[in-house]
């Protein structure tokens, strides 16, 4: 009889161990061959953007001489106002982000005079760093199968905490994105108001293109990151300023580009492409008057990314 009891006890123990092993197996095997691991990892918050800030510069020609290089048919004083309206319309179409900057200056006979900067460098305010809650701690894997049931309960608890944590983090991040969008919109409104309030006076003395480029180069040097510059001009330099600014790795767009003589326009374009490349510009695009639109300027400034 004792032998029968021992046999029944052995069978019962075997069944219990088999049941325990089966219970563990149903949760998977993420924690190794012993017991299952968590089935839901908390989403890792996106790292702060590492994209460089962008500084956008706009140089607008307000000079008009009426000489052989710039004939009376040149559309000035329409050019400054057209340029101002174009820039104001393009700003909300750019991918502006906190940390990006904008400035604008006149091209005149004395372009490198600081008084020609009618829109001082302004930066989109940076947002404060997100204070995210700590992620829940992953349960410690069990040492053996005897701890499997307890571990399985810890896994279930962890998964619930991770789900809640992920939702909380997602909500905080969305609020931050919404706040940044409002900050950018407010910034754009202010810059647009300043652009539309600008009143360019016609300068009959001459045109100093290189002086304007020197202003832009100085601003770019003080603001690390990507640099994008738009000049609204026919690029007829009549002053011959000896300054040679550093436009290293800047993207340059020449807009509202027009000369009465098509041949002169083509020759000048090639000369300026070479000159700007010598100054370090990475790329130069020429947009004739008819092709200079709000959308085209925005597209060119977004070209090549941040």
Regions found by a protein language model. Give the residues of each.
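Bacterial N-terminal signal peptides that target proteins for export
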Residues: 1-13
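C-terminal motif of bacterial Sec signal peptides marking the signal peptidase cleavage site
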Residues: 20-23
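Bacterial signal peptide processing site
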Residues: 25-28
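Von Willebrand factor
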Residues: 51-224, 228-230
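Extracytoplasmic/secreted cell-surface and envelope-processing proteins
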Residues: 66-73, 112-116, 237-243, 262-267, ...
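VWA/integrin I-like adhesion module and closely mimicked acidic/polar interface patches used
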Residues: 235-275
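C-terminal helix of von Willebrand factor
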Residues: 266-306
């Amino acid at each position: 009889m004792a032998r029968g009891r021992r046999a029944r006890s052995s069978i019962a123990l075997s069944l219990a161990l088999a049941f325990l092993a089966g219970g563990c197996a149903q949760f998977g095997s993420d924690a190794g061959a012993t017991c299952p691991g968590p089935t839901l990892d908390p989403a890792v918050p996106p790292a702060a953007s590492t994209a460089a800030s962008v500084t956008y510069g706009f140089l607008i020609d307000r000079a008009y001489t009426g000489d052989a290089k710039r004939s009376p048919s040149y559309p000035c004083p329409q050019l400054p106002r057209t340029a101002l309206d174009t820039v104001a319309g393009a700003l909300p179409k750019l991918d502006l982000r906190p940390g990006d900057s904008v400035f604008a200056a006149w091209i005149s006979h004395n372009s490198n005079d600081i008084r020609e900067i009618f829109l001082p460098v302004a930066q989109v305010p940076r947002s404060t760093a997100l204070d995210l809650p700590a992620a829940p701690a992953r349960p410690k894997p069990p040492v053996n199968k005897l701890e499997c049931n307890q571990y399985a309960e810890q896994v279930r608890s962890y998964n619930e905490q991770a789900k809640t944590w992920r939702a909380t983090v997602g909500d905080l991040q969305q609020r931050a994105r919404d706040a940044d969008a409002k900050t950018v919109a407010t910034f754009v409104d202010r810059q647009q108001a300043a652009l539309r309030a600008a009143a360019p006076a016609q300068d009959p003395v001459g045109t100093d293109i290189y002086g304007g480029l020197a202003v832009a180069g100085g601003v770019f040097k003080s603001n690390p990151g990507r640099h994008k510059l738009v000049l609204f001009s026919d690029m007829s330099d009549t002053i011959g300023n000896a300054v040679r600014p550093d436009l290293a790795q800047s993207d340059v767009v020449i807009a509202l580009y027009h000369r009465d003589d098509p041949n002169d326009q083509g020759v000048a374009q090639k000369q300026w492409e070479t000159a700007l490349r010598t100054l370090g510009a990475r790329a130069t695009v020429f947009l004739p008057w008819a092709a200079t639109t709000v959308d085209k300027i925005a597209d060119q400034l977004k070209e090549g990314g941040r």
